[in-house]
Structure formats: structure tokens, C-alpha cells
A protein has these predicted regions:
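Transmembrane beta-strands of outer-membrane beta-barrel pores
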Residues: 5-7, 21-25, 48, 62-68, ...
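Aromatic- and glycine-enriched pocket-lining scaffold segments that form the walls
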Residues: 1-65
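Residues that define the transmembrane beta-barrel architecture of outer-membrane proteins
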Residues: 1, 36-40, 74-78, 120-126, ...
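Solvent-exposed loop/turn segments connecting transmembrane beta-strands
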Residues: 29-35, 68-74, 150-157, 183-189
Length: 208
């Protein structure tokens, strides 16, 4: 179940709140082992125009649910996110910039590996990324991420990505990405990814 509502706010600020309740599993984060095991998610979003070309989005999130250890063990997630957009109105198809970042704190109840006693594992992770449109056809971007593991916060993984996007037309997109990852076990990984998108039919609405 999900409810979204626009909240009262000072002039010039758009404020939106979302609350969700659901029962089910969400990968390794939440697990419903009992009939009454439900998870709760809340998000508060604020938007403001800084100028006719620049705007900012700020958000706070909270999630609570049962994890895979059992119904008596919970995981809590706290998140902060921010998005900055620069898009000049008269030249938006030639130049624009988009920056995003998100920080997440995890508090996970579990049994200690040594004594099998209840403990709370506290982990932190974040990512930050940016994309800049060079001209009508080319966009460059980069992303950095770093996160502790939820079950073992003393183990930290990190990674860096660089991407290049080419737009042959408004109906197609070609993207190449290189990613380097360094895992807590001192193992490195190098990945090359390629993506091709195309659209059939009428011209769709432009994204915000």
C-alpha cells in the first residue's frame, strides 16, 4: 500500500511525502518470515528552483522491516539524497548538467559470529555521480560509490564508473561504460558495458 501527498510548504518550495507499507521480501534487506512481518518505507522530498535554469531536489528516506535472521530482528535504513540540475532553457538540447548523490545508513540486528548474541551492525554507503551534455549528440558522465557491507561493516567495497553516450537521433541512444570495482577482499574487477536503445512510434514526451 502506498500513499503520496503534497504537503504545505513556504512559497517557492514543492514538498511531497510518500508512505508505504508492504509484506514480502526485498532481496537481502527485508524478509517476511511471519504473517505479521510487514515493512514500512517513508520518503520526504523537497524541490526548489534556484534560477530559471537551475533547480535542486532534496530528500530524506526511512525504512523499517524484519530481516532474514528472524521476526525479532529488524533492519533500519536512513537515507539522504540530492539532485542538482542545470538546463539552460534556450540551449538545453546542446548543454546541460545533472549531479546526484545519495547517502544511506544501515542498522541491522543480527547474531554475533563469535558468541551468537544479539548485536546491531551499523554500515554506511554512498554514491555520487555527474553527467554533462557536451553538445546535441554527446554526453559524458562519471560515478563513484563506496559502501560497507550490511552484515560485516568492517568490509568495504568501492567502485568508479565512466560513461560516454552518443545520440544518433531523438529516437536512439548508444552508451558505453567502463567500471572499476575494488572489493574488501583486495580483489579488483574491470567491466566494459555497452547499451543500445531505440524507440519505435511517435515522439514521446521530453523527460523533466
Amino acid at each position: 500500500m502506498s500513499v503520496t501527498r503534497i504537503l504545505p510548504a513556504p512559497k517557492g518550495i514543492f514538498l511531497e511525502g510518500t508512505a508505504q507499507v508492504y509484506r514480502g521480501d526485498s532481496a537481502n534487506v527485508f524478509t517476511a518470515t511471519g504473517r505479521k512481518d510487514v515493512s514500512y518505507v517513508g520518503h520526504l522530498r523537497g524541490y526548489r528552483d534556484l534560477s530559471e535554469s537551475t533547480n535542486v531536489d532534496l530528500g530524506f528516506s526511512y525504512a523499517f522491516g524484519h530481516n532474514d535472521v528472524g521476526s525479532a530482528f529488524h533492519t533500519q535504513l536512513y537515507g539522504l539524497d540530492a539532485t542538482l540540475r542545470w538546463k539552460p532553457l534556450r540551449r538545453s538540447i546542446y548543454h546541460h548538467f545533472l549531479a546526484r548523490t545519495e547517502l544511506v545508513w544501515s542498522h541491522r540486528d543480527q547474531l554475533s559470529a563469535a558468541l551468537l548474541l544479539p548485536e546491531t551492525q551499523r554500515a554506511f554507503g554512498f554514491y555520487t555521480s555527474g553527467e554533462y551534455r557536451l553538445n546535441r549528440r554527446w554526453t559524458v558522465g562519471a560515478r563513484y560509490d563506496r559502501s560497507d557491507r550490511a552484515r560485516q561493516a568492517n568490509l568495504t567495497d568501492s567502485g568508479f564508473s565512466a560513461l560516454l553516450t552518443y545520440w544518433p537521433s531523438e529516437f536512439s541512444q548508444v552508451r558505453g561504460q567502463y567500471r572499476f570495482a575494488r572489493y574488501a577482499e583486495k580483489q579488483d574487477a574491470n567491466e566494459l558495458r555497452f547499451q543500445f536503445l531505440f524507440v519505435l512510434g511517435a515522439h514521446g514526451a521530453h523527460p523533466f
